[in-house]
Amino acid sequence: MFSMNSEYILSKKSEDISPFYVMEVLESAQVMEAEGRHIIHLEVGEPDFPTAPHICEAAYDAIVRGSTKYTHSQGFFPLREAIVNSYYQKFGIDLSPNQVIITSGTSPGLLLVFMALLEKWDEVIMSNPYYSCYPNFVKYLGGVPVYVYTNETNGFALEPETVKQYLSPNTKAILINSPSNPGGYVMSPENLKGLAAIADERGIPIISDEIYQGLIYSGEEHTILEYTNNTFVVNGFSKLYAMTGWRLGYIICPSECVRVIQKIHQNFFICANAFVQEAGISALKGSQEYVTDMIHVYNARRQYMLKRLLGMGLDVRKEPTGAFYVLADARKYSNDSLELSRSILNDVGVAVTPGIDFGNGAEGYLRFSYSNSIENIKEGMDRLEAFFGKNLKDNYSIY
């Protein structure tokens, strides 16, 4: 008989999942706020803007109409059609709505792609630094992340000639993210073309995380779909449309892979939320003025934050032109980014993300998010300047 005092026997692979260090920072900040301290949050990677009113109204209208049932496991056809039309308008790419699978956010989309592709010991090539969840997805499914240490002056992007050195008989996919988290960098067309050539020559698909697509402030933006069909694109509405809590994403994949991913989706998730899909249609088909206004505000914040960080002695060797992050080198102060972020939080009440959250390739770095008001960013920069200025004056490394 089961005893309430028995210990649960948990799987080793679940215990091996690494934590989000940023959550430790956030939770510590929340405790401090509960005690009455004013904390400036520069660690959170989500828009501070509300979702546009016309998107909210579409969801409300859908609920009133009774759009609260299961949908097709691939998602509403009008939403899939709107997605492929969006890619055509932006990039001139002809896609079929039947290549699209709607998911409850981008993370389930990534998980579904990895579940469809990976066998035990299969390798996935990815850059280091990387988004924290990537290795956990791969390892949990029995795969092996293969890390390519990348160069900040190239925006920490995978370079084709370097990637070739990491190919093996076990390579199952190459994973890219542009615009990127944590760096806020946009991959060049040359890099995308080179990686696409590898995919086509070797028969190795590229998994492209494009969740920050559209959040770009300088230069041209491209998608891997311009250069190869041998790709699984994962995208969503969270960042560009300020819809993080709505949980709406999608996969664009080769036609021959749709049925496999659809079956997995049916078993694990069934379908995405019906009225949220209706909101997604409104987001894509409605006015984009709200998005344009957000991008202008983000850009002003980006320029201000970058200038202030450089002025206080942090190094940013390539200008970030996408997403809403600045990844700054703080190694003149400390090689331990987690302890440094704790000190900043405790001493001056600013929450920032330690670089170690994104792999040892970002250790000694700090990630700053400008998805906060300009007033809060200014206050945060003033506090950081006081923190780093004191340590410059004392002329010593904190750790």
Where are these regions (language model features)?
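Conserved N-terminal alpha-helix of the aminotransferase class I/II PLP-enzyme fold
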Residues: 70-103
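A glycine-/small-polar-enriched, mobile loop at the entrance of the PLP active site in fold-type I
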Residues: 40-48, 61-80
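PLP-dependent class I/II
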Residues: 1-10, 15-20, 25-28, 32-38, ...
